[in-house]
Regions:
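Alpha-helical elements of the RecA-like P-loop NTPase motor core of helicases
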Residues: 10, 42, 121, 151-152, ...
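Short coil-to-helix "N-cap" segments within the ABC nucleotide-binding domain's helical subdomain
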Residues: 20-34
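Conserved beta-strand edge residues that scaffold enzyme active sites
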Residues: 45-46, 157
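Conserved H-loop
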Residues: 22, 38-45
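C-terminal boundary and immediately downstream tail of ABC-type ATPase nucleotide-binding domains
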Residues: 145-163
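ABC-family ATPase nucleotide-binding domain "signature/switch" substructure
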Residues: 1-4, 10-15, 31-37, 47-147
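DNA transaction DNA-binding modules
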Residues: 8-9, 25
Length: 163
């Protein structure tokens, strides 16, 4: 799941099935529900048969990200790479995307590249890279206790809110 979602001029159903072309409509709809994209799809005039503009330009960035997550749910990879999946969306949309990502990340190996620490704080292992070098690693709690680079980033992003 990339920061810039690739969608093509076709139906939402077919854009989702790009991750698994043999998926049934029921599987597509389940992926829509699990990815939280069903909440906006059900309000579209043709729902899953709605034709997207090239690149999905008739959807918001957050909606495109949710479809990308739905596509990944249908693909069901053993290893999942999330590259800045929430970087260009507002805070409310980020919450929807993070909820969808929890569904997607369950029971698989995940590699998450993120600047927003809210995206990674539930990870088993967090590797902090600064200027191309690994400077810290551990889980969220361990890294906060070290009060190093991760701690400073966390405090900057969350303005000292309770940890």
């Amino acid at each position: 799941v990339l920061q810039d979602t690739v969608l093509f001029k076709d139906t939402i159903e077919n854009n989702l099935k790009y991750g698994n072309e043999t998926a049934t409509f029921e599987e597509v709809k389940k992926a829509g529900i699990m990815s939280n994209s069903n909440y906006f799809i059900k309000n579209l005039p043709d729902r899953y048969n709605t034709v997207l503009s090239e690149g999905g330009s008739n959807l918001s960035q957050g909606q495109r990200q949710l479809l990308s997550i739905g596509r990944a749910i249908l693909a069901d990879p053993k290893i999942l790479i999330l590259d800045e999946a929430t970087s260009s969306v507002d805070t409310r949309t980020e919450k929807n995307i993070q909820d969808a990502m929890r569904n997607l990340m369950a029971n698989r190996t995940n590699l998450i590249i993120a600047h927003r620490l809210s995206t990674i704080q539930d990870s088993d292992v967090i590797v902090v890279i600064d200027k191309g070098e690994i400077v810290e690693q551990g889980n969220h709690k361990q890294l906060l206790e070290k009060q190093g680079k991760y701690y400073n980033l966390y405090m900057t992003q969350f303005s000292g809110k309770e940890i």
